[in-house]
C-alpha cells in the first residue's frame, strides 16, 4: 500500500513538473515575441529620428524620442534576462523529469 502511495505521488510530481516545463516553454515563446516587437520599435524610433530635424520641429521631440528609445531598449534587456531565467528553470525541470523517468524505467 505504501508503495502504491509513493507511485501515485511520483506520477503527480511528474505531471506537475511536465506542466511547468510546458508553461515555461510558452512563456519563453511569448517573451521572445516581446523582444522582437520591442526591437522593431527601437528601429522605428531610429528611423523617425532621422527624419526629425531641429529646424523642422521642437527639440523637445528629440528628447522624447530618445527617452522612448531608452525605455524600449530597457524592456528588451529585461525580456532577455527573463528568457534566460525561464530557460534555466526549463532545463532543470527537463533534467529532473528525465531522472524521474529513468527511475521508473
Curated annotation (Swiss-Prot):
Keyword Coiled coil assigned: yes
Cellular component annotations (GO), alphabetically ordered: cytosol
Keyword Cell inner membrane carried by entry: no
Subcellular localization(s) per the UniProt record: Cytoplasm
Alphabetical list of InterPro entries matching this protein: DUF496, UPF0265
Domain of life, source organism: Bacteria
Residue ranges of coiled coil: 21-41, 67-102
Keywords, sorted A to Z: Coiled coil, Cytoplasm
A Pfam family the protein falls into: DUF496
Biological role stated in the UniProt entry: Pole-localizer protein involved in the regulation of several cellular processes.
Family designation: Belongs to the pole-localizer TmaR family.
Name of the protein described by the UniProt record: Pole-localizer protein TmaR
Organism: Erwinia tasmaniensis (strain DSM 17950 / CFBP 7177 / CIP 109463 / NCPPB 4357 / Et1/99)
Lineage: Bacteria, Pseudomonadati, Pseudomonadota, Gammaproteobacteria, Enterobacterales
Primary gene name: tmaR
